[in-house]
From Swiss-Prot:
Source organism per UniProt: Aspergillus parasiticus (strain ATCC 56775 / NRRL 5862 / SRRC 143 / SU-1)
Broadest EC class assigned to this enzyme: oxidoreductase
Keywords for this protein: Glycoprotein, Membrane, Oxidoreductase, Transmembrane, Transmembrane helix
Matching Gene3D superfamilies: NAD(P)-binding Rossmann-like Domain
Location (main, coarse): membrane
Highest classification ranks of the organism: Eukaryota, Fungi, Dikarya, Ascomycota, Pezizomycotina
Function: Averufin oxidase; part of the gene cluster that mediates the biosynthesis of aflatoxins, a group of polyketide-derived furanocoumarins, and part of the most toxic and carcinogenic compounds among the known mycotoxins. The four major aflatoxins produced by A.parasiticus are aflatoxin B1 (AFB1), aflatoxin B2 (AFB2), aflatoxin G1 (AFG1) and aflatoxin G2 (AFG2). Within the aflatoxin pathway, the averufin oxidase aflI catalyzes the conversion of averufin (AVF) to versiconal hemiacetal acetate (VHA).
Protein name from the UniProt record: Averufin oxidase A
Family to which this protein belongs: Belongs to the avfA family.
Length: 285
């Protein structure tokens, strides 16, 4: 029996993955889902507890809880890492704070199982903005604006990916990075078409439903993509919801701007103090 673990199933990405797995997966699949709120998950998937094909086991807990993670990751060959935070608040560390205990649990399994240990594959949602080949397709000024506004979120994801890269070198896990463009229609449930890419042209918008289907295909073809970044592009019509994205950009940009101004103010104050001290020393000569 193949086992998939899904972290963050109540978010737009996680729910789209779960929906696709429930509809398209073989009956032999076993899905282990870790969520903060089981009630919220069952509101979105009311038949989940009675589903027998595929089998679904729901674990309530935090993505930083070692016991909950150990239960969720047990025997999993694929781990969908969909824990994320809307916006880009300064200082966010959610992705890396989740990556560290995941790696720790897998290291414990590696030590206990010894030579029989089979590393699982982490399928980590990233962004086309962090993929040089795909980011180069976007006008430079747009890329700079987005990178400025989502700086904290991107820094968090990059650090988490660095942890996975280091763990891969130790044989603890494999990883695949999934790089979609802007994501839309969080409430949509029907894919309209997508294609996996590396450096080919990427459409500006992709629906969450198509992202979920794409991540499931990537998991099915995992051996082709280990240690690589995989882009996703839409091939069908996408219901675009730019208002949500613009709000996240505005919130992230405002936070980054306030941080930048605060840092500059500190530098100015230190410089003023230095000049005052220097003036006092010179007047005493």
């Amino acid at each position: 029996m193949v086992t998939y673990a899904l972290l963050g199933a109540t978010g737009a990405t996680g729910s789209s993955i779960l929906r696709h797995l429930l509809q398209k997966s073989p009956d032999s699949l076993h899905i282990q889902v870790l969520v903060r709120s089981k009630v919220k998950l069952l509101q979105a998937f009311p038949d989940l507890e009675t589903t027998r094909r595929p089998q679904v086991h729901v674990i309530q807990g935090m993505s930083t809880d070692s016991d909950a993670l150990s239960e969720c990751l047990r025997n999993a060959s694929i781990v969908f890492m969909c824990v994320a935070q809307n916006g880009s608040p300064i200082g966010t560390t959610l992705c890396q704070d989740s990556a560290r205990p995941i790696i720790s649990v897998l290291q414990q399994q590696q030590q206990s199982e010894g030579a029989s240990y089979q590393p699982c594959t982490i399928v980590q949602l990233r962004s086309a903005s962090l993929n040089p080949a795909l980011a180069a397709q976007v006008p430079a000024f747009v890329h700079r604006i987005v990178s400025f506004c989502l700086f904290a979120n991107y820094a968090d994801i990059k650090q988490a990916c660095q942890y996975y890269s280091e763990a891969q070198k130790q044989g603890t896990l494999e990883y695949i990075l999934v790089d979609p463009p802007t994501l839309h229609d969080a409430n949509g449930t029907h894919p309209t078409g997508y294609r996996l890419i590396s450096t080919e042209p990427q459409a500006t918008a992709l629906s969450y439903a198509d992202l979920g289907a794409a991540m499931c295909e990537i998991a099915h073809r995992e051996s082709e993509f280990h240690g690589r970044a995989v882009g996703v592009t839409a091939t069908g019509r996408v219901r675009q919801t730019w208002g949500v994205l613009l709000r996240h950009l505005l919130e992230g940009g405002s936070s980054r701007l306030r941080e930048t101004i605060a840092k500059e103010a500190v530098v100015v104050r230190v410089l003023c103090i230095f000049l005052v001290i220097l003036a006092c020393l010179m007047s005493s000569l």
